[in-house]
């Protein structure tokens, strides 16, 4: 039974990832006043399937100087972690209702750094290594602010359990009392998922494709799927944290519809940002985080800690 549950979670995610690639190409196309994919199937709807068949039937080439084991493990690890992070997300019922769901999410996103590092290092190519080092520095840096923002939100929530966030936001979305945190969180998730304008790891003009430059066919497709699964997951997480979906215990379907709509809107905004903004310079990226976001998030975290104490109230206990 548990296997069926896992499959019922994983298969829709992989389908969503497949069609997100199509949506992205369509959105970028229309924003640049062209059509986007429209040959394969009606309105180009079969394009992702054609892409998948093409990628997985090609020969997976491998550089002769690369270290084989790591080269193969890295993409598998990337996709596995991307799918694992969906486990504690309440939609409205999570696959496993963890007491420390938020901590689990943080731990998994930190582990994702290893797949990037291994892929860059195992490729034995200087471009892949530079791309991997950039990606690792960026991901690790932005995780600092993500963790502090999460801490501030959890002080309002009262526990590390993600399901209680639904109850916390029954009357008021957390984006209203903590909108600066929400804005910084959104920008940090852009950086965390290596999306434009923070896609320095895959700067085409200087690094060809970044850490996955030596990958072809199947393994490359795994990296690609991991990236898009992470994008949808981060937006779902943002929805749960700040845009608490409407929850009526008698009609859980309404929650799911509400939740999916908000997640889709956020994902579309990711694509919109990609079409609108140029890439940051590397020093600007780091400056934004260490000089702007970190002091602000720390100050707001102290505010969230001290306010309940000052007003002699206690944070919600669960």
From Swiss-Prot:
It is found in: Mitochondrion inner membrane. The keyword ATP-binding does not apply. Keywords: Electron transport, Membrane, Mitochondrion, Mitochondrion inner membrane, NAD, Respiratory chain, Translocase, Transmembrane, Transmembrane helix, Transport, Ubiquinone. The chain crosses the membrane at residues 2-22, 70-90, 100-120, 146-166, 171-191, 222-242, 254-276, 294-314. GO terms for molecular function: NADH dehydrogenase (ubiquinone) activity. The keyword Electron transport applies. GO terms for cellular component: mitochondrial inner membrane. It comes from the Eukaryota. It is an enzyme of class 7 (translocase). It holds the Pfam family NADHdh. It is a multi-pass membrane protein. Its EC number is 7.1.1.2. It catalyses: a ubiquinone + NADH + 5 H(+)(in) = a ubiquinol + NAD(+) + 4 H(+)(out). GO terms for biological process: mitochondrial electron transport, NADH to ubiquinone; mitochondrial respiratory chain complex I assembly. Belongs to the complex I subunit 1 family. PANTHER family: NADH DEHYDROGENASE SUBUNIT 1, NADH-UBIQUINONE OXIDOREDUCTASE CHAIN 1. Core subunit of respiratory chain NADH dehydrogenase (Complex I) which is composed of 45 different subunits. Core subunit of the mitochondrial membrane respiratory chain NADH dehydrogenase (Complex I) which catalyzes electron transfer from NADH through the respiratory chain, using ubiquinone as an electron acceptor. Essential for the catalytic activity and assembly of complex I. This is NADH-ubiquinone oxidoreductase chain 1. The lineage of its organism: Eukaryota, Metazoa, Chordata, Craniata, Vertebrata.
């Amino acid at each position: 039974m548990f296997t069926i549950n896992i499959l019922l979670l994983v298969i829709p995610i992989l389908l969503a990832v497949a069609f997100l690639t199509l949506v992205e190409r369509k959105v970028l196309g229309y924003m640049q006043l062209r059509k986007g994919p429209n040959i394969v199937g009606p309105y180009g709807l079969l394009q992702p399937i054609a892409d998948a068949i093409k990628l997985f039937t090609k020969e997976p080439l491998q550089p002769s100087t690369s270290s084989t084991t790591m080269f193969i493990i890295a993409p598998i690890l990337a996709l596995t972690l991307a799918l694992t992070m969906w486990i504690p997300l309440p939609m409205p019922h999570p696959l496993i209702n963890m007491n420390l769901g938020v901590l689990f999410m943080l731990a998994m996103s930190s582990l994702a750094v290893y797949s990037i590092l291994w892929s860059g290092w195992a490729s034995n190519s200087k471009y892949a290594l530079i791309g991997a080092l950039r990606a690792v520095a960026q991901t690790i840096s932005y995780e600092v602010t993500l963790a502090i923002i999460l801490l501030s939100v959890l002080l309002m929530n009262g526990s590390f359990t993600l399901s209680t966030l639904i109850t916390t936001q029954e009357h008021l979305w957390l984006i209203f009392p903590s909108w600066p945190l929400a804005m910084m969180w959104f920008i940090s998730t852009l950086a965390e998922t290596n999306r434009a304008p923070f896609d320095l790891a895959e700067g085409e003009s200087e690094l060809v494709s970044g850490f996955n430059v030596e990958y072809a066919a199947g393994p490359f497709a795994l990296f690609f799927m991991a990236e898009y699964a992470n994008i949808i997951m981060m937006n779902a997480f943002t929805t749960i944290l700040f845009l608490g979906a409407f929850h009526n215990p008698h009609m859980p379907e309404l929650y799911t519809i509400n939740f999916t709509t908000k997640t889709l809107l956020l994902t579309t905004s990711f694509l919109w940002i990609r079409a609108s903004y140029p890439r940051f310079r590397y020093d600007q990226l780091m400056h934004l985080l260490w000089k702007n976001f970190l002091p602000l998030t720390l100050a707001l975290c102290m505010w969230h800690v001290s306010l309940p104490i000052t007003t002699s109230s206690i944070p919600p206990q669960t």
